[in-house]
Amino acid sequence: MSEGVAQLKHEGSRQQVVVAGAAAGLVSRFVIAPLDVIKIRLQLQIHSLSEPTSYRGLNGPVYKGTLGTLKQILRDEGVTGLWKGNIPAELLYLTYGSVQFSAYTNISQMLDTIPAPYTLPSSANSFISGAGAGAAATTVTYPLDLLRTRFAAQGKDRVYTSIVASLKSIAQHEGPTGFFRGLGAGVSQIVPYMGLFFASYESLKPVMADSPLPLPLGSSDAVAGVVASVVSKTAVYPLDTTRKRLQVQGPNRARYVHRNIPTYSGVLMTLQHIWKHEGRRGMYRGLTVSLLKAAPASAVTMWTYERAMGIMVAFEKDGME
């Protein structure tokens, strides 16, 4: 670890971690909202573009790549279509950021108390802390994640007219478990993803800080976040697709922008079905836009978190002097 480059667990008080995490989540979500909608639309598209018969007569859009999807959403739904589901998504990112960074700090500090000779290496500590933080934040915020997906999947036919209406509809027709469809896939995806992300970030952060190339305004945090995100996102992407497919199950499955989404039941069955009928492309559909989204999102998240934390710590020091 480069001297003078603090690990996340050593930065700020618990209250400052919560505030910095919330700020990071809010700013990040606003920046990447359009890419998130495009990614979800591509992930829910089951037909193969190389086989025209698979979507002939389909009552719905056929998206072709990131730019093609962007143009079609703008043409069919206008600019606001790129921010569908943004209210539950902002609440999701705000809450997720707070829980994630708080849990990461607490778990990491707890692991530091393990006595020798069982003390964990720094990378293992970061991986376990990131995995635990991701699992906690995903579980706590999952209903908001599900709402975000369903709103983003709406086309011209509005399945839900408002957040309140969506809550009432899901509770009435699907029960409490309806808010947690795909949670198993979500946790299965996020545990290795956030473990790899934080382990990579903590390792890359001092390397970027010592870079011979000048990186202004703390952008070394952003660069470390980008690299960590690309590595971890690619590794677990099929589980992310599985989660999205499961989140739109239920009585309104055929009313979303893609009206031919199959019926899925469980993580393994969904993975098997996608692999059998869509192959590897189906597993990684939307990966390009996902990386285009994840890279800047992680960069903005980590940059905002580090800057917000730095400002609060500086104010606290000034107040004590």
From Swiss-Prot:
<feature type="transmembrane region" description="Helical; Name=5">
    <location>
        <begin position="213"/>
        <end position="231"/>
    </location>
</feature>
<keyword id="KW-0496">Mitochondrion</keyword>
<protein>
    <recommendedName>
        <fullName>Mitochondrial thiamine pyrophosphate carrier 1</fullName>
    </recommendedName>
</protein>
<comment type="function">
    <text>Mitochondrial transporter that mediates uptake of thiamine pyrophosphate (ThPP) into mitochondria.</text>
</comment>
<feature type="transmembrane region" description="Helical; Name=6">
    <location>
        <begin position="286"/>
        <end position="303"/>
    </location>
</feature>
<dbReference type="GO" id="GO:0030974">
    <property type="term" value="P:thiamine pyrophosphate transmembrane transport"/>
</dbReference>
<feature type="repeat" description="Solcar 1">
    <location>
        <begin position="12"/>
        <end position="110"/>
    </location>
</feature>
<feature type="repeat" description="Solcar 2">
    <location>
        <begin position="121"/>
        <end position="207"/>
    </location>
</feature>
<comment type="similarity">
    <text>Belongs to the mitochondrial carrier (TC 2.A.29) family.</text>
</comment>
<feature type="transmembrane region" description="Helical; Name=2">
    <location>
        <begin position="91"/>
        <end position="107"/>
    </location>
</feature>
<dbReference type="Pfam" id="PF00153">
    <property type="entry name" value="Mito_carr"/>
</dbReference>
<dbReference type="InterPro" id="IPR018108">
    <property type="entry name" value="Mitochondrial_sb/sol_carrier"/>
</dbReference>
<feature type="repeat" description="Solcar 3">
    <location>
        <begin position="216"/>
        <end position="311"/>
    </location>
</feature>
<feature type="transmembrane region" description="Helical; Name=4">
    <location>
        <begin position="182"/>
        <end position="199"/>
    </location>
</feature>
<keyword id="KW-0472">Membrane</keyword>
<keyword id="KW-0812">Transmembrane</keyword>
<keyword id="KW-0677">Repeat</keyword>
<dbReference type="GO" id="GO:0005743">
    <property type="term" value="C:mitochondrial inner membrane"/>
</dbReference>
<dbReference type="GO" id="GO:0015234">
    <property type="term" value="F:thiamine transmembrane transporter activity"/>
</dbReference>
<dbReference type="InterPro" id="IPR023395">
    <property type="entry name" value="Mt_carrier_dom_sf"/>
</dbReference>
<dbReference type="InterPro" id="IPR002067">
    <property type="entry name" value="Mit_carrier"/>
</dbReference>
<feature type="transmembrane region" description="Helical; Name=3">
    <location>
        <begin position="127"/>
        <end position="147"/>
    </location>
</feature>
<keyword id="KW-0813">Transport</keyword>
<feature type="transmembrane region" description="Helical; Name=1">
    <location>
        <begin position="17"/>
        <end position="38"/>
    </location>
</feature>
<keyword id="KW-1133">Transmembrane helix</keyword>
<keyword id="KW-0999">Mitochondrion inner membrane</keyword>
